[in-house]
Regions:
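Active-site beta3 strand of CheY-like receiver
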Residues: 55-61
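C-terminal output helix
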Residues: 97, 115-128
């Protein structure tokens, strides 16, 4: 009898985006890689903070422009509770100011929505613990 090979657990991903269809598209992209597992969806920044604390994902995909609190504020709050959190900011903006604000908030990386399909999985694998 052979010993079972220890397969690494999947990378647990939380999606925080207020556009339901875009969130579903993100999940479809992530489903193409067996190493990634979506563990929750948040529709606003406040819900993202609550879910991040309760499900403790490996990586959080955080939209910047969301209701209640934006992605920058949600990132700051999550980092206060979970300093080790790996958060990738997602946005349609290529603004240098937004990139700087994302880093200041504690984001591990930044992916523009026009490059999601090409870069998202690589970005997750790069920042995941």
């Amino acid at each position: 009898m052979e010993a079972a090979v220890n397969m690494p657990e999947g990378i647990r991903v939380l999606i925080a985006d207020d556009h339901r269809l875009f969130g579903q598209a993100l999940e479809a992209i992530l489903a193409t890689d067996d190493r990634l597992e979506v563990v929750g969806h948040a529709g606003d920044g406040s819900e993202a903070v609550q879910l991040a604390i309760s499900v403790d994902p490996d990586v959080i995909l955080m939209d910047i422009a969301m209701p209640i609190i934006d992605g920058f504020q949600a990132t700051k709050q999550i980092r206060r509770h979970q300093p080790q959190a790996c958060i990738l900011m997602l946005t349609g903006s290529n603004s240098r100011i937004d990139v700087d604000r994302a880093r200041e908030a504690g984001a591990a990386g930044y992916v523009t929505k026009d490059r999601i399909a090409a870069e998202l999985i690589d970005a997750i694998l790069e920042v995941a613990p």
